[in-house]
Each structure stands twice: as structure tokens, then as C-alpha cells.
Amino acid sequence: SPSTVTVALQKLESRLGAQLFRRTTRSLSLTPDGERFLETCRRTIAELDAAMEGLTGHGPLRGRIRITATNDFGRATLCPFIHTFLAQHPDVVVDLLLTDDILDLVDEGFDIGIRTGPLPDSALHFRLLVRGPRHICAAPAYWDEHGRPTHPRDLASHNCLILGRSGAPLHTWRFQSADETFSIRVDGDRLANDGEVLRTWAIAGAGVVLKSRWDVADDLAAGRLESCLDAFMADPVNLYAVHPAGRALPRRVEVMLTALADHVTGS
């Protein structure tokens, strides 16, 4: 019951000699001491979990794996991979969250995050999964109607589909010409925080989208989308699997990371 939990928390705070929570009549939140204590507990539990798995050697993988990934990669690649992985390891449970926002893996308790680089967060360890170019894409019917750009500045006259991440729409697209890297501001009548939505709109002929190769490879091959300005595209984008630093990885997480890297490289 709530009263039992309250008493237990008060006893814990008394024993530690620190206030772990801020309490109001309507909310309960962690203090800085509480956040540090929670992270230490999470790390300890993860290390104990890894130690127990280590004792079982090569026995069946067990336990929960929490993963977050981008919408496009999650739907196109990660979901089929998880289906196959769980068929091979039936005692594992996967908790998957798809979002194009950058989440705090530590605070939100994720084991693995799938992100594109660069990765400025030193609190994370990372493993490179794949490198690939980006493409300026639209449906062939859109290009036929509005014309195919021959230089990035031509995008100013096109309806560009914008990814809106955490309230900060990505209106600036990067390009390169010879040794020069430059940016072009683009705009259009549609923004979304889900890359899959942008892809769907582009296939429907609504406008131009900037996508990573691994997100639209099948669409390009099938002719649903057509790329332009490939000669101006900037450096390839890295796709990483990241996990919190400073904690031992449970064997189930390590095995999944290795299998995912092999799967992505093979595909």
C-alpha cells in the first residue's frame, strides 16, 4: 500500500542519513542524492546479474533487455531481428521503445540504444553497427512534376519533409562539394517527429525527404523512391549500438549486441 511504501522509504532515508525524495502533496521526485543512490543501485544490480549469468556459463539466456531505437531502423530492421532472436532464446524478454528523440539511457533504465553519430555523451559505450550514406529522396512522380534538383540550393523551391526532434525541427541539411562542406536551410508544409511518417509521405508524393540508406534501401530498389544529389551528400552516417558505461553487461545483452551487429552487417 502507499502508506507501507512511504514508511519503507522514510526508514531507508533515516538509515542512509540523506533525503532521497522531494515530496509535495501532488508529486514525488528524486533529489540529487536520490539520483546518485538509484544509479549506484542499478549498477550493482546489473553487475550482480552479470555475475550470476557468468556462473551459468553457456546456459540459456534469461531476463529482460530494454532497447530504444529510431522509428525507421526499429521497424525495418530491429523488429524482425528481435523476432528471430527470441525464437532462439525463449527465456529472454525484450522491452522495445521506438522514438526519434534522444533518451537518457541511464535515467530511463535502457540496456541498449540504437543511435546515429556523432556521439558526444561520454557516459556511453558504443559499438559501430554500420556506416552508410544519406539520400535526398522523393517519389518519381514528385520529381516528374516538380523537377529534379541539380544542386542543393534548388531545394529551396521544393516541399521538404522535416524531422521535428524534441521540439527542434531539423531544417538544416548538410552537403559537400569538392573539399567544402556547407548547409542548406529547407522548409515545407509537413513536420513529424517520426521518420517513418516522413518516409510514408515521401512515397505518397508529398515532398522531398533526407533519409539514411538503411532506412530506404528497399524503397530505392523497388522504385518507390528515387534519390537525387548523391554527388553532394556529406560523409556517411554511423549507426551505433550504445549502452551505459561503468557497468558490466549481462551476458544476454552482450549476446544480443553481437548478434545484432552480425545481422546488420549481413543485411
Label for each model-derived stretch:
Residues L12-E13, L225:
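Conserved amphipathic alpha-helical core elements
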Residues T25-L28, E35, A46-T68:
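Short helix-loop hinge/linker segments at domain boundaries
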